[in-house]
């Protein structure tokens, strides 16, 4: 198997009932250059067994870590620590991805030169309810590269999907 380029990270706590939907969306990805990294923050439901079944399916690359309940920020920091890909994207257990999400992100990233990548902390993408309806407003016209705060200062409203360079997240862990 090829080296993966992006980690889809999911912190979870007692969300076994929701993980299957996300798993199904990951199996449908048109690009498989990702791994799914799950940090279980002390679940007492069927999360561990469910993830073990996903791993046995062997359809996508999955890494699973269990920690005693410590909070989402601690789970996030562990995810970043255990990540071995250039890019890191947090996708919550109650979310799912469009079939081309990984492909779209990687195509965008691959167009950047190494020098350009060092100037960027990552990629901001739309989040939506489905492929037709985004959450909030479109990005301001002409703002292809900007700091996140500048997007919002220039009229962007609503939630976004954030894909970060893993090395940047390592420099700035959650307190």
Locate predicted features:
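Cell-envelope/extracellular polymer assembly enzymes that use nucleotide-activated donors
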Residues: 4-7, 35
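Short, well-formed alpha-helical segments that are part of the catalytic scaffolds
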Residues: 15-28
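A conserved acidic beta->alpha catalytic loop
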Residues: 25, 40-49, 92
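Short beta-strand/loop segment that forms part of the nucleotide-sugar
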Residues: 33-42, 63-68
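Glycine-rich, basic loop-to-helix element that forms the pyrophosphate-binding segment
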Residues: 67-83
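Short aromatic/hydrophobic "clamp" motif used to bind/position activated sugar donors
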Residues: 88
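Conserved donor NDP-sugar-binding/catalytic core segment of glycosyltransferases
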Residues: 100-135
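Conserved nucleotide-sugar donor-binding catalytic segment
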Residues: 129, 135-175
